[in-house]
């Protein structure tokens, strides 16, 4: 064996005979270990490339789609009263369609203000722990358990087109962008009330009733939390959907049999329109004041029809209403027989809806209305009817009272104060208050869905839930007054603090007014 080749014995015994040739193991210092981990972290760290960001956004949107959650909106919270809340959509045909104003659409010369059906959402108290079982009457018959209404009514693309028209950019690109915004913003938001749940058991006694009218660019779903909170405390609230062109979009849906008899489609979409879309029968243009008068007349007719529905419900016609409704809900309507306290019926509205509610009070069919709740009565919706002859509660948002708006030659705040003063003189029961830190949309669901956006856009300082708590509390106090004649210990029992906005009536009143109320309320007029 050549002498320069390693021998097996050398290899096997090298560790003993040649210790210097063995590698030396050196301890790793903590600093070196940290450095190695840092290098590994840099290698593992994703690079924020456009493709990486888009991939993660796509995964997030896909997860939202699969889970049916809206990526840009917060879920509506549950109700806090002692009762759970049920809801039913009812759309009922008139015995004979009514044309409330002669204006026609430019597009097809069809009547712009033709009232065929009335659509309303009922919110009512139900027992805790119940789950809905919805049986749809129209084919195919199917049962849906634990069903909730969507906050954005279907089809979504109609609502998107309505918002595009509000923005004045009704073209295919704008519609697509609005559709995407609506889907991402609220497409899967649901109202946390159980559809078709049974009414609270009869031992609860007669239930007070509120009929509510939504504002411009709103719909019957946009006040679901305010009305649901009332329902969770024993009130039956009916939110009316207005088809006067002031809503982004709505669908007039007649029962299939009625539509077949009339040889027409069972669904007629109504997308937002304004005076530029209308003509008088003689071909002349419709002015903005004329449009508002026609819209309010149409709203009055819808509110009066809603009152008639509630009277029929109380009279025991629930089964007939269920059968006539094109929405397929209302299996428990017969249980409403004799359950409504129509002697304590309150007509309410927000913004444009508040103006309409005041106007509807003048109609003989509204003679049995016991009181009115007026939230931010409209500034651009025409004159306010000031001959109110029922107890009246006017609640302004902070933004509504603070802005010095000209209203037919005088400050809007002064006009509203005189409205309340007239009601006080005629009925000895009227209040005018401002909730501090709130904005015009504070009574709607929008601040709950988009808290940061609404604070930035609308300027509200009071939290969304606290604001709604105040609206609900003062409304319940007023309903209690209508029912019992007693003001209670809430805001209706407080003396005047500010006859004009943000100006104390006296230093003595400022010192006597509780601090916890002073940060929230100004009382401008009281019984």
Where are these regions (language model features)?
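Alpha/beta-hydrolase-fold serine-hydrolase catalytic core, especially in secreted/extracellular enzymes
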Residues: 2-8, 12, 33-57, 440, ...
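N-terminal membrane-anchoring alpha-helices
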Residues: 27-84
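Domain-level recognition of soluble alpha/beta enzyme cores
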Residues: 63-210
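Short substrate-entry loop that stabilizes the transition state in hydrolases
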Residues: 187-207, 212-250, 402-404
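The feature captures the conserved acid-bearing segment of alpha/beta-hydrolase catalytic domains
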Residues: 201-202, 367-441
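Gly/Ala-rich beta-loop-alpha elbow adjacent to hydrolase catalytic centers
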Residues: 215, 348-357
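Alpha/beta-hydrolase active-site loop
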Residues: 244, 250-342
């Amino acid at each position: 064996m050549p002498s320069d080749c390693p021998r097996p014995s050398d290899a096997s015994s090298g560790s003993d005979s040649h210790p210097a040739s063995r590698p030396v193991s050196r301890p790793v210092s903590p600093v070196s270990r940290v450095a190695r981990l840092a290098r590994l972290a840099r290698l593992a760290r994703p690079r924020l490339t456009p493709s990486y960001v888009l991939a993660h956004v796509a995964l997030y949107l896909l997860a939202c789609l699969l889970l049916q959650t809206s990526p840009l909106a917060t879920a509506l919270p549950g109700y806090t009263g002692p009762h759970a809340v049920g809801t039913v959509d009812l759309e009922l045909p008139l015995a004979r369609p009514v044309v409330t104003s002669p204006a026609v659409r430019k597009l097809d010369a069809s009547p712009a203000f033709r009232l065929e059906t009335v659509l309303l959402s009922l919110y009512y108290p139900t027992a805790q722990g119940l789950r809905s079982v919805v049986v749809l009457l129209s084919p195919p018959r199917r049962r849906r358990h634990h069903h909730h209404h969507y906050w954005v009514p279907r089809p979504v693309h109609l609502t998107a087109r309505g918002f595009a028209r509000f923005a004045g950019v009704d073209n295919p690109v704008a519609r697509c962008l609005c559709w995407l915004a609506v889907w991402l913003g609220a497409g899967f938001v649901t109202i946390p009330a159980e559809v078709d749940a049974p009414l609270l058991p009869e031992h609860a006694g007669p239930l007070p009733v509120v009929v509510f009218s939504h504002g411009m660019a709103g719909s019957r779903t946009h006040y679901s939390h305010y009305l649901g909170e009332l329902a969770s405390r024993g009130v039956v609230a009916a939110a009316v959907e207005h088809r006067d062109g002031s809503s982004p979009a709505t669908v007039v849906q007649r029962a299939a049999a009625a539509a077949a008899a009339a040889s027409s489609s069972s669904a007629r979409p109504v997308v937002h329109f304004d005076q530029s879309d209308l003509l008088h029968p003689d071909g002349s243009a419709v002015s903005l004041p004329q449009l508002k008068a026609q819209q309010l007349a149409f709203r009055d007719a819808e509110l009066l029809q809603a009152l008639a529905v509630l009277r029929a419900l109380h009279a025991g016609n629930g089964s007939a209403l269920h059968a006539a409704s094109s929405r397929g809900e209302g299996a428990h309507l017969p249980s409403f027989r004799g359950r409504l306290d129509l002697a304590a019926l309150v007509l309410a509205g927000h913004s444009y809806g508040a103006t309409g509610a005041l106007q509807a009070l003048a109609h003989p069919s509204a003679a049995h209305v016991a009181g009115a709740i007026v939230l931010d009565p409209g500034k651009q919706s025409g004159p306010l009817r000031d001959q109110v002859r029922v107890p009246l509660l006017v609640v302004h948002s902070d933004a509504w009272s603070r802005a010095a708006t000209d209203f037919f030659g005088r400050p809007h705040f002064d006009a509203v104060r005189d409205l309340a003063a007239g009601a006080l003189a005629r009925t000895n029961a009227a209040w005018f208050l401002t909730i501090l830190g709130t904005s015009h949309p504070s009574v709607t669901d929008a601040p709950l869905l988009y808290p940061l956006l609404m604070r930035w856009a609308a300027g509200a300082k009071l939290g969304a839930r606290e604001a709604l708590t105040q609206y609900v509390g003062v409304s319940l106090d007023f309903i209690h007054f209508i029912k019992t004649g007693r003001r209670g210990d809430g805001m209706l029992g407080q003396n005047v603090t500010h006859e004009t906005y943000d100006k104390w009536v006296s230093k003595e009143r400022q010192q006597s007014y509780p601090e916890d109320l002073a940060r929230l309320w100004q009382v401008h007029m009281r019984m």
